[in-house]
Regions:
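Residue-level preference for beta-strand/loop junctions
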Residues: 32, 61, 108-110
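Short beta-strand His + acidic residue motifs that chelate non-heme Fe in jelly-roll/DSBH
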Residues: 53-54, 99-107
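Non-heme Fe(II)/2-oxoglutarate
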Residues: 1-33, 46
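A short hydrophobic beta-strand segment most commonly corresponding to one strand
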Residues: 65-67, 108-119
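A short beta-strand-loop-beta hairpin characteristic of the jelly-roll/cupin
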Residues: 48-53, 60-62, 68-87
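Conserved metal-binding segment of the jelly-roll/cupin
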Residues: 45, 84-101
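Short beta-strand segments enriched in hydrophobic/aromatic residues
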Residues: 42-44, 69, 118
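Long amphipathic N-terminal alpha/beta scaffold segment
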Residues: 33-35, 40
Length: 119
């Protein structure tokens, strides 16, 4: 799996001023009181669909929001078997401690999501 990452906020500071400023209203709509991390993930198309591997974003009592930026046949899935197809403008919010995985796409050149960890 090949993935490009652009970090917007991490390590208690803004890493990408321009993008961070564009997202102020988005953070407000999520009711963010404190950011932990925000990053853009771009996963490259593969010939077969597979998961990237189950993981937690952190062990804090925080929330994760995954915002799907484009429509493709990839998914966000959970160990429970529950899954959400990658549809542009779809937002999934869940506890950051919940194990989840992305699934690569095979139908378009890339799967793009924004991953926000916050209180």
């Amino acid at each position: 799996m090949y993935q490009f990452i652009h970090t917007i906020f991490d390590d208690y500071k803004v890493q990408s001023d321009e993008l961070h400023n564009l997202l102020v209203d988005f953070y407000r709509q999520l009711n963010v009181t404190a950011l932990i991390r925000n990053k853009l993930n771009c996963t490259i198309k593969e010939n077969t669909r597979r998961t990237a591997g189950f993981h937690t974003d952190n062990e804090l009592d925080a929330l994760t929001a995954i915002f799907h930026l484009n429509t493709n046949n990839g998914k966000t899935i959970f160990e429970s078997g529950e899954g959400y197809e990658s549809k542009a403008n779809r937002l999934i919010t869940f506890p950051s401690k919940l194990r989840h995985s992305g699934m690569v796409c095979t139908d378009v050149n890339r799967r793009m999501v924004m991953n926000v960890n916050f209180y």
